[in-house]
């Protein structure tokens, strides 16, 4: 009965700015329960807003937690995973729809194509690299989608401090420092992302990029 109620609530939820959000996160759960709790809360927040999930396709770690939460809540889940990672990142049954791609570049490009915004939960090198690429693509003008950082228990404080250092030392323009939106809770982060408007001047207009070469220009309908 509870599952049916959650699914009905998700279907009935009014559509906001985002139909699908891409979440980058670890294939590990981390050493403290607070990280898993944050993944569950973000999943519940997406469900409450009727937002579908695009993610890295794994069924383990934080990836598995958020994917199962969104799926159980009645919202769509699309996982994008390179064939080479399937043995290590999928344990047992996959969660939701899974699209298999050839490599990491294609994975990021497909996740970006399918999403209206991006959020990074705590994670390792891969999560940080995905986050930084989406920030860079925004700076370059390849996309204008919000990029959010769920700063769970200060996990990303050092990274945010590094961004501030880069701006202070003249390597990151002040307006580009505003590309990243951060908050300690899922509810606050989604609220900020709903209100986000681009304030930086992109390096080049989106129409000037060879999107087919970058693997980014198609809409979900064209994919």
Swiss-Prot record:
Q: Known EC number(s)?
A: 3.2.2.n1
Record keywords, A-Z: Cytokinin biosynthesis, Hydrolase
Q: Which domain of life is it from?
A: Eukaryota
Record GO cellular component, one term: cytosol
Query: Which tissues and organs express this gene's product?
Result: Expressed in shoot apex, immature inflorescences and flowers.
Entry binding sites for substrate: 89, 107-108, 124-130, 136
**Protease recorded as keyword:** no
Region of interest (Disordered), ranges: 201-223
Which Pfam families did the record assign?
Lysine_decarbox
A single BP term in Gene Ontology: cytokinin biosynthetic process
Q: Which family does it belong to?
A: Belongs to the LOG family.
Name the NCBIfam families on file. Answer: Rossman fold protein, TIGR00730 family
Role summary: Cytokinin-activating enzyme working in the direct activation pathway. Phosphoribohydrolase that converts inactive cytokinin nucleotides to the biologically active free-base forms.
User: Which protein, by its recorded name, is this?
Assistant: Probable cytokinin riboside 5'-monophosphate phosphoribohydrolase LOGL1
Q: What species is this protein from?
A: Oryza sativa subsp. japonica
Gene symbol of the encoding locus: LOGL1
């Amino acid at each position: 009965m509870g599952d049916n109620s959650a699914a009905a609530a998700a279907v009935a939820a009014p559509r906001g700015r985002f139909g699908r959000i891409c979440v980058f996160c670890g294939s590990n759960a981390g050493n403290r329960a607070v990280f898993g709790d944050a993944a569950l809360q973000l999943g519940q927040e997406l469900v409450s807003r009727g937002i579908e999930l695009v993610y890295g396709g794994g069924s383990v770690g934080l990836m598995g937690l958020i994917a199962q939460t969104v799926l159980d809540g009645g919202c769509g889940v699309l996982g994008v995973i390179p064939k080479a990672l399937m043995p290590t990142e999928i344990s047992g049954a996959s969660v939701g729809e899974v699209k298999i791609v050839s490599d990491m570049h294609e994975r990021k490009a497909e996740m970006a194509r399918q999403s209206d915004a991006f959020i990074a939960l705590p994670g390792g090198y891969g999560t940080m690299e995905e986050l930084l690429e989406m920030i860079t693509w925004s700076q370059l003008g390849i996309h204008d989608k919000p990029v959010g950082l769920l700063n769970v228990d200060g996990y990303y404080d050092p990274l945010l401090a590094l961004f501030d250092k880069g701006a202070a030392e003249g390597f990151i323009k002040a307006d580009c420092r505003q590309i990243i939106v951060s908050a300690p809770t899922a509810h606050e982060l989604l609220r900020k992302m709903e209100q986000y408007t681009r304030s930086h001047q992109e390096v080049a207009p989106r129409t000037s990029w060879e999107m087919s070469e970058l693997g980014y220009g198609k809409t979900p309908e064209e994919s």
